[in-house]
Amino acid sequence: MIQQESFLTVADNSGAKRIQCIRVLGTNRRYAHVGDVIVAAVKDAMPNMGVKKSDVVKAVVVRTKATLRRETGNSIRFDDNAAVIINDDKNPKGTRVFGPVARELRERSFTKIVSLAPEVI
């Protein structure tokens, strides 16, 4: 579960390395899970890239340490909390996605992120 002040690693090549959650988008929502959109501040970035430190960006959560229960009864969890930076059209800013992503992103219409990911769990 991601909440305000949570740090996430960035799983794409947009230039950011770490982001900090400012707000979970939605009507008065407290926690973000896989597939939710958050507003975040870039805390660590690579030089000469698309995003800079202290930029405010939108991102979609692709991995969480919290256990994710599926309707089939399976449960999965990842080793880190990670997000992919997106633009206003829900397309990723980067051209590559690193690491596995959850299958729930396809159901939430983030098909571009799913197609760029090396593995969908």
From Swiss-Prot:
Signal peptide annotation: none
InterPro entries referenced in this protein's UniProt entry, alphabetically: Ribosomal_uL14, Ribosomal_uL14_bac-type, Ribosomal_uL14_sf
Pfam families recorded: Ribosomal_L14 (PF00238)
A GO molecular function held by the record: large ribosomal subunit rRNA binding
GO process terms (BP): translation
Any Gene Ontology CC annotation: cytosolic large ribosomal subunit
Keyword annotations: Ribonucleoprotein, Ribosomal protein, RNA-binding, rRNA-binding
Keyword Transport tagged: no
Function of the protein: Binds to 23S rRNA. Forms part of two intersubunit bridges in the 70S ribosome.
NCBIfam families: rplN_bact
Subunit structure comment from the entry: Part of the 50S ribosomal subunit. Forms a cluster with proteins L3 and L19. In the 70S ribosome, L14 and L19 interact and together make contacts with the 16S rRNA in bridges B5 and B8.
Family note: Belongs to the universal ribosomal protein uL14 family.
Protein name: Large ribosomal subunit protein uL14
Gene source species: Synechococcus sp. (strain CC9902)
Recorded name of the encoding gene: rplN
